[in-house]
Amino acid sequence: MERVRDFSPYELKVSVYDGAAEKRTMLMDGHLYMVKFGYDAAPQEEHPSRTSYVNLPVNEYIGSKVFAASGIPTQDVILGDYKGRSVVACRDFMYEMDPNLMLLHFKQLEISMPGGSSRSKARPDWEFVSQVLDEHDALEGIRARARHRFLQMTCVDALIGNFDRHANNWGFIADRRTADILDLAPVYDCGSSLSPSLSREGMRERVEDPQQMREANMAAPYMAMNVGGKRRKFAFFLTSETARPFRAELPELWPRLSEEVTDRIVEQTPGLDDLQRVFYKATLDARRKYVLGPAYRMALKEAETSTATVGNDTLATDIVPGIPFPGLGGNPGLLH
């Protein structure tokens, strides 16, 4: 298991990164890092269980590790302490690349679409996101991969309960001289997940009451995306007809995000106490069962129906021998 790293001896400089949370820049062992701090929020009378964002570094760490386990390239993260404060160091993947390369956020594609400046929002519409993915000429070389990434990223965000995957929180690697998009960027910014503002008392209440754990994860969070003009809960969206292409990714992702996998990630997270370990394991398990599970079972049935339909069509269709027919073969897997 990794240990919590003491970053106190290192000089932290002004942040060169955007975003709301407190952050600084650190050079360590030849690598550049964005250092994110946990922090206390003012108590809210209407939400007494949401009084602290001190868990944000841990949530960034666990969320990033879950993404990495899913097979999606993800930022490297190190949990640490800076002069008594909890922090997470996120390695700047651009720092070690060719200086002629730059990170291009999806937001920049939105506003460069015809009429995009009026349709690009802090919380994007799925219909517009889909149009950008399908039509933007800058994606010509990686269009299929970009759509695949967004669909899978949304599914993993549903597992970790990330409510902040807006258009500035994912993107591409581009040539700054020509603005040509060359590749997908690793996933970054996963801190707004796993109930980052929940107090220890709130954690304890959920751990001690499985029904509350289930209901809390079914009810929240909302996605950082509108669908049909409304912000949707992950659980509602993933079982809707609109989400069919999203849940079609779940049979591939499911074995990579099993209970064994996420439990191991939590066990290997340094610095957690017993309550936190139980809470994070139980939260990921609840979200897998109640948010992803129904959509996964739908995806299996839809795949079976699609295969059966293709099979029936095949009987009545003249097919040139030796040419594979799409949709045949492949075991979608079993629900664990």
Model-identified regions with their sequence ranges:
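Conserved kinase catalytic-core segment
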Residues: 55, 127-199
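Short alpha-helical "patches" and their helix-cap loops
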Residues: 77-83, 166-175, 300-302
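A short, terminal or domain-edge coil/loop segment
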Residues: 2, 7-11, 126-141, 199-201, ...
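ATP-dependent phospho-/nucleotidyl transfer catalytic cores
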Residues: 93-155, 159, 240, 264-269
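An exposure/low-complexity boundary signal
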Residues: 90-100, 160, 166-167, 172, ...
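Conserved ATP-binding subdomain of kinase catalytic cores across diverse folds
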Residues: 1-117
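C-terminal catalytic region of ATP-dependent kinase domains
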Residues: 176-327, 333-335
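A broad, structural surface signal
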Residues: 61-69, 148-157, 282, 286-289, ...
